[in-house]
Design a protein with these regions (language model features):
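G-domain G4 guanine-recognition motif of GTPases
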Residues: 67, 98-102, 120-136, 142-150, ...
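Conserved C-terminal guanine-recognition region of P-loop GTPase G domains, centered on the G4
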Residues: 52-60, 75-143, 171-175, 198-214, ...
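Canonical P-loop GTPase G-domain recognition
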Residues: 117-175, 179-184, 213-222, 259-260, ...
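Conserved hydrophobic helix-helix packing surfaces used for dimerization/oligomerization
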Residues: 14, 183, 289-291
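Long, well-ordered amphipathic alpha-helical subdomains in the mid-to-C-terminal portions
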Residues: 176-204
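Conserved G1/Walker A P-loop phosphate-binding module
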Residues: 1-78, 82, 86-89
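Short, flexible loop segments at the rims of nucleotide/cofactor-binding pockets, characterized by
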Residues: 41, 70-76, 99-103, 162-164, ...
Length: 399
């Protein structure tokens, strides 16, 4: 994906599920108008989830996911079914492809139960309608044929209706601004920064400021103080990369609100309150306690990486405890969090809302406090209250 494309996390994720040879891959190819997936009469041709980011009318930017057969067998088959279940954790919408010549099976019914359990909007597409008539169709059902394309346009329209309202009103920072406001963005550029570009949360925040008809000034942490002195207008707020919190707090006058990209991202993803409540667990940590530090992506680690170097160092300095720190990255996230006393997650800019919510709920179900990098660093640096003063309800939660 190029830097000009919509980020994967901001695309609607549409998963196609079903038994082997129900025609999932054929339906996916018909919907996308591309040979996205290999098609064969051999059962189990799709052995791993196939993901494709694309623009698909009338939905717009989407990620299409073709999954292995849910009735796969054997040791490898069980692993494929497990991968299919993992896809459910990020699916904004599900399409169950059923072989119309065979009808609904127990495996199909199990998938429907999983959709309902996870509150995933779904449709049931009876494929091969050119070979057999579908049963009497319910509200969520329709007949399609990947061969003749019967029902394919209707399927696309109905998927669009299911997903149309998702994320429409979400803003990173624009809802906190009034047109004409001035916002200062602090973006450190160190050995861990990507070459030639800003990281995704910084890009997205900058764009949201502009979309709100406001002015963004982008500076490094070592030029913040002189920049503020030159301004004739007081900024509405200063937004910083969390790792520079301590210096930016010192250099930003107390009458200017201060927060971080990570904190705004937690709010955008819907778990900021959980993060604020969860960070208090740091003060209860004891020697030997297990802490999971989780990343949503698999970027190359540098010598001063925030997740594997800086946060562990600051945790040790703050708590004085001998903690057992463990790390996960990308899609590798533990299903059982009960052994941990705390989960510290990144901002989640590379994860869509569904997957971020799944991770938060997994921690909640295990009774494990869940927080994120920005809130953690603000707490460790003693500026948590200041970092959330833009959000009065959360500010009131803190002593």
């Amino acid at each position: 994906m190029s830097l000009n494309d919509t980020p994967s996390a901001e695309r609607v994720h549409i998963g196609f599920f079903g038994r082997r040879n129900a025609g999932k891959s054929s339906v996916v190819n018909a919907v996308t108008g591309q040979e996205l997936s290999v098609v064969s009469d051999v059962k189990g041709t799709t052995t791993d989830p196939v993901l494709k980011s694309m623009e698909l009318l009338p939905m717009g930017p989407v990620v299409i996911i073709d999954t292995p057969g849910f009735d796969d067998e054997g040791a490898l088959g069980e692993l494929r079914v497990k991968k299919t279940k993992q896809i459910l954790n990020r699916a904004d919408c599900a399409v169950l492809v059923v072989d119309a010549t065979q009808g609904l099976t127990p495996a199909d019914q199990e998938l429907i139960a999983l959709f309902q359990e996870k509150d995933i909007p779904y449709l049931v597409a009876y494929n091969k309608s050119d070979l057999a008539a579908a049963p009497q169709l319910g509200e969520k059902e329709l007949a399609v044929s990947a061969v003749t394309r019967e029902g394919i346009e209707e399927l696309k329209e109905r998927i669009a209706r299911l997903t149309r309202s998702q994320g429409e009103d979400k803003r990173l920072v624009g809802d906190l601004l009034t047109p004409g406001d001035l916002v200062v963005l602090v973006t450190p550029i160190d050995s861990a920064a990507p070459k030639g570009r800003l990281i995704l949360p910084q890009q997205q925040t900058n764009r949201d400021v502009l979309d709100a008809d406001c002015t963004a000034i982008v500076v490094k942490e070592n030029t913040l103080a002189p920049t503020l002195e030159k301004l004739a207008v007081k900024p509405r707020m200063v937004i910083t990369d969390s790792q520079a919190f301590a210096q930016v707090d010192r250099d930003t006058p107390k009458d200017i609100p201060l927060t971080s990209f990570s904190i705004l991202m937690a709010r955008y993803k819907g778990f900021l309150e959980d993060a604020v409540r969860g960070v208090a667990a740091i003060d209860r940590l004891q020697d030997g306690d297990r802490v999971l530090i989780a990343e949503g992506c698999t970027h190359h680690r540098q010598c001063e990486d925030i997740g594997t170097v800086k946060i562990p160092r600051w945790l040790g300095e703050y708590t004085g405890k001998n903690l057992r720190l463990e790390h996960s990255s990308g899609r590798d996230f533990p299903e059982d969090l009960s052994p941990y006393q705390l989960v510290i997650h990144c901002g989640g800019c590379m994860l869509n809302g569904r997957e971020m919510d799944y991770r938060r709920k997994t921690a909640a179900d295990a009774g494990v406090p869940f927080t994120n990098y920005g809130i953690t660093i603000a707490h460790l640096k003693g500026i948590l209250k200041r970092s959330v003063e833009l959000f009065p309800d959360l500010y009131a939660l803190l002593p």
